[in-house]
Amino acid sequence: VVTLYPSFPLHEDYTKLMGGSVERLAINDKLQIDLTKLIERAAQPAKLLIFANPMNPSGSWLNPEQLRQLFAAKHPETMLVLDEAYHEYAVHGNYTSGLDLTELIPGHWVVLRTFSKSWGLAGLRIGFGVCSSTELCQALDRPRTPFNTNQLAQIAAKAALDHEDYMLH
């Protein structure tokens, strides 16, 4: 699994927990993604390439053109996971969600979002993912334990989505 460093530690922790190995790509001295290094590595096959965009901990992100360059270079056998946990905080500048550019991503991909950050529902442990295909979604759902998201969390997430304008102000 290829990931950026430093970044959200659970990308590495879960990989190791499942017996996988982690390859770290260092971000630059300005705490931004080294696009050249990322594109060079993305062109080579890997089981998974996962990183936060916007970045954790720096808040920097790849702009739409940089995402296009990355997607064009990505090896088609590598699954790409974009962790957009901080998506709602990127309300200024030239941020674009990976969801707006998915037609450009070769092969399998997943975009992750959470209600933990801007929605303030961290204790409820709820989020969602959008997958490149129904088959991938079903494959990812197979090992999920039953009842892993409680009803209160589901009700709170729905209420948050019903009042998105409140969160944005």
Feature map (PLM): residue ranges:
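PLP-dependent aminotransferase-like
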Residues: 1-51
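Glycine-rich, N-terminal phosphate-binding loop of Rossmann-like dinucleotide-binding domains
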Residues: 5, 52-53, 84, 89, ...
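Active-site donor-binding loop signature of nucleotide-sugar glycosyltransferases
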Residues: 27-29, 53, 114, 142
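Active-site pre-lysine segment of PLP-dependent enzymes
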Residues: 16, 33-45, 57-80, 84-118
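Amphipathic alpha-helical repeat scaffolds
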Residues: 53-56, 150
